[in-house]
Amino acid sequence: MSWQAYVDEHLMCEIEGHHLTSAAIVGHDGAVWAQSTAFPQFKTEEMTNIMKDFDEPGFLAPTGLFLGPTKYMVIQGEPGAVIRGKKGSGGITVKKTGQALVIGIYDEPMTPGQCNMVVERLGDYLLEQGL
């Protein structure tokens, strides 16, 4: 299965009638492996900061998580494994695997829990596959 198929079929899939706004799988180096059409253009520095938060949990808390034009307030995640962010009625979930970051961005009517489930399910699967 191609990386694009993972994004299209596993991240952008329908959950209780709702979809993520956008999603991507990005290497630890910031290289995009696959993304949905609406996934924001981001700076390499933004991915570097996300990776730093996985290594040093709490690193992003004072400044927020920036991805493209959006700043998310970092909320409770799982140190070293999952970063969650909130902005208005939407937010972001980032799951770290051995080689990649699985990223999902949502807005109402999708809930934070639905976004977490979709992103973390694929992230856990990739971890099981040694990726």
From Swiss-Prot:
Spans traversing the lipid bilayer: none
GO cellular component: cell cortex; cytoskeleton
InterPro entries membership: PFN (IPR048278), PFN_euk (IPR005455), PFN_sf (IPR036140), Profilin_CS (IPR027310)
Major location (coarse): cytoplasm
GO MF annotations, alphabetized: actin monomer binding; proline-rich region binding
Subcellular location: Cytoplasm, Cytoskeleton
UniProt keyword list: Actin-binding, Allergen, Cytoplasm, Cytoskeleton, Disulfide bond, Phosphoprotein
Superkingdom of this protein's organism: Eukaryota
Disulfide bond entries: 13-115
Note: The variability of the residues taking part of IgE-binding epitopes might be responsible of the difference in cross-reactivity among olive pollen cultivars, and between distantly related pollen species, leading to a variable range of allergy reactions among atopic patients.
Job of this protein: Binds to actin and affects the structure of the cytoskeleton. At high concentrations, profilin prevents the polymerization of actin, whereas it enhances it at low concentrations.
Name of the protein in question: Profilin-10
Lineage: Eukaryota, Viridiplantae, Streptophyta, Embryophyta, Tracheophyta
